[in-house]
């Protein structure tokens, strides 16, 4: 088993913003801990057979479950820097919403990343209303917290986009940066809607999961 890397191959300004917002750079990952998607993994047929192949009861997130099974059987994957797959990011918010809704639904079905999803619910359903209440009652304190939180929320995408839009005309660059919070919020809402649907499916199909 070996894992490679992937890079966005954008065709439009929107796709540059999308890729910068949702995809990590090579410098941001730890190769030994990286879990490749199906686009950037290579394995022998014997390894595939050893772990039972891709879980057919999953329509999304099946590659992560497959990764975990391979890692449990063979340990950390060798990382091949020169094996790079290029792909085009989603070109509109509708397609992006559907994609991340389905990813989160797959997480729920496979019981993946529960803490990560809980943090997201806490942020939007507890922390954000608290900050908005502060803005209503104590304007300066609320605005300070909102600005600090927004800075942390958008920091990494902004750092990526800064390099990816170097040399652009200022108006185009400003529009690209304005997309970051929109893309992040749309993706988070999609995940918060999709994850409980996956959990409900998992609860209703325990027999299917146990027999896999």
Predicted feature residues:
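Membrane-embedded multi-pass helical conduit in multi-pass membrane proteins
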Residues: 123-202
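Short linear elements at protein peripheries
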Residues: 201-212
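Residues at secondary-structure transition points
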Residues: 38, 61, 91, 95-98, ...
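Catalytic donor/gating beta->alpha subdomain of glycosyltransferases that bind UDP-sugars
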Residues: 55-114
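Short, hinge-like loop/turn segments at secondary-structure boundaries
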Residues: 16-23, 96-98
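A recurrent flexible, glycine/aromatic-enriched loop bordering the glycosyltransferase active site
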Residues: 8-10, 24-46, 50, 59, ...
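Conserved donor NDP-sugar-binding/catalytic core segment of glycosyltransferases
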Residues: 1-15, 76, 83-84, 88
């Amino acid at each position: 088993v070996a894992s490679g890397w992937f890079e966005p191959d954008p065709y439009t300004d929107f796709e540059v913003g999308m890729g910068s917002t949702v995809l990590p750079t090579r410098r941001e990952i730890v190769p030994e801990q990286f879990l490749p998607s199906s686009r950037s993994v290579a394995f022998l047929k014997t390894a595939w057979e050893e772990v039972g192949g891709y879980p057919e009861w999953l329509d999304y997130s099946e590659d992560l479950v497959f990764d975990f099974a391979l890692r449990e059987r063979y340990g950390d994957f060798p990382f091949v820097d020169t094996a790079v797959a290029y792909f085009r990011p989603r070109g509109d918010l509708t397609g992006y919403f559907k994609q991340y809704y389905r990813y989160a639904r797959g997480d729920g079905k496979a019981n993946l990343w529960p803490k990560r999803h809980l943090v997201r619910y806490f942020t939007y359903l507890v922390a954000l209303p608290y900050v908005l209440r502060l803005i209503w009652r104590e304007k300066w304190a609320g605005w300070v917290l909102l600005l600090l939180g927004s800075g942390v929320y958008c920091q990494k995408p902004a750092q990526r986009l800064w390099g990816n839009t170097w040399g652009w005309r200022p108006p185009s660059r400003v529009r690209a940066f304005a997309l970051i919070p929109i893309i992040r919020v749309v993706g988070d809402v999609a995940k918060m809607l999709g994850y409980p649907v996956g959990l409900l499916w998992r609860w209703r199909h325990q027999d299917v999961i146990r027999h896999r």
